[in-house]
Structures are given as C-alpha cells and as structure tokens.
C-alpha cells in the first residue's frame, strides 16, 4: 500500500494512477478538498484523506510500504498562523511518516526548497525522526528540468539496497552518497548516546 501527500497545485490522482498501474493500493492525502475531488473524478481507486500533514499523518503504525510526496513538504517551512512553527510542523510530519511506514519502507519526497537552509532544516528533522537516506538532484544545471528529491528509508537500509542515481549528471551521486553517509554516522552517534529513533527536541 502507498500513501501520497500533495501541494495545492497538484492532486493525489496524478501519481496515484501510476502507483495503481503497478498493483499498489493507494491512499491519497491533501489539505485541499478541491484537489481530493479532482482525484476522485479522475477515478482513483484507492481511498482519499483530507488532512494537514503539518499536524501529522493520521495512520496506524506500519500501514504503508511506501510514500510519495509531490511539491508539498517545503510548505511546512512557512507559517500561515502565529502558532505554526515550521520545525514543529516538520517534526509532526516526519515522526508520523516514520511510524506509519513499515520498517525498511521508503519515502520519495519531491520538493522545492527556497533556500539551502530550508533543505538543511527538512533533512535534519527527517534524520532526527529516525530516517536514513539522502538528497538526489536531477538535472542540477537546468533551471526548468531541475528536480530535488529526498529519498528516505524508515530505519537502516538492507545491504542489497541501492540508492537512486540522479538523472542528467554523472557527478551528483558523489554528493548524495556523502550526505547518506552523514545520515548514517549521525544516527549511529545518537543511538550510542541513548537516543531512540523518533526522539526530537
């Protein structure tokens, strides 16, 4: 089973159709009822959930094999109301994302961070919530085709798992592997000092 989160400009039906074609049962999540209605009109066979991911994902532990998020997570870096603190909203999302994924489950998060600091904040919170993984940048030298992905694994990857290779360059994989190593080393250091996965301050 797969779940998805989407921005206000896309809807769960787009990637949901592709996942369904590959035999997956899909649950689409969106903060906009209009986008959910569009997905329903397109004939998405799975379930739809009206939810603000900044308040956490409303699913049981170990529900999903994988998660796809398209152009949504970066919006958690902004505050629309006084009580909305970006780090807290990111923590609510990644903590619940971690626990609703099966151990070893994967999350592919496509995002558009406005600054390097935003990307660092997002990846840092994901790591503190127990994820390993890294950032892949497709076509980094193209303004139109450039895409940034946060590729996450709930827990440590198995030995046979190969991280995605970026499109449009042969050198980007080096930076990605370096970031992934950083994830693993920092995570092991935290565990050595007695911090459990999912503990975020």
Each PLM stretch: what is its role?
Residues 67-72:
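Hydrophobic beta-strand segment of the Class I
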Residues 84-103:
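A short glycine-rich, Lys/Arg-flanked "PGG" loop and its adjoining helix->strand segment in the class I
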Residues 129, 139-201:
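C-terminal lobe and adjacent flexible extensions of AdoMet/dcAdoMet transferase-like proteins
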Residues 73-75, 112-117:
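Short "lid" loop at the C-terminus of a central beta-strand within the Rossmann-like core
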Residues 7-57:
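Class I SAM-dependent methyltransferase SAM/SAH-binding core
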């Amino acid at each position: 089973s797969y779940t998805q989160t989407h921005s206000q400009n896309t809807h769960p039906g787009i990637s949901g159709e592709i996942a369904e074609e590959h035999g997956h049962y899909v649950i689409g999540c969106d903060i906009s009822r209009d986008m959910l209605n569009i997905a329903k009109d397109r004939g998405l066979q799975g379930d739809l959930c009206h939810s603000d991911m900044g308040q956490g994902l409303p699913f049981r532990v170990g529900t999903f094999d994988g998660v796809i998020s398209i152009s949504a997570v970066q919006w958690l870096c902004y505050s629309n109301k006084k009580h909305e603190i970006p780090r807290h909203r990111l923590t609510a999302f990644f903590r619940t994302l971690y626990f609703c994924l099966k151990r070893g489950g994967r999350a592919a998060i496509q995002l558009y961070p406005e600054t390097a600091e935003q990307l660092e904040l997002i990846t840092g919170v994901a790591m503190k919530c127990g994820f390993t993984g890294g950032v892949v940048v497709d076509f980094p030298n193209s303004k139109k085709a450039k895409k940034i992905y946060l590729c996450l694994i709930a827990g440590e990857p198995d030995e046979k798992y190969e991280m995605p290779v970026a499109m449009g360059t042969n050198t980007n994989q080096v930076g990605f592997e370096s970031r992934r190593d950083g994830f693993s080393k920092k995570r092991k250091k935290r565990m050595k000092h007695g911090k459990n996965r999912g503990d975020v301050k």
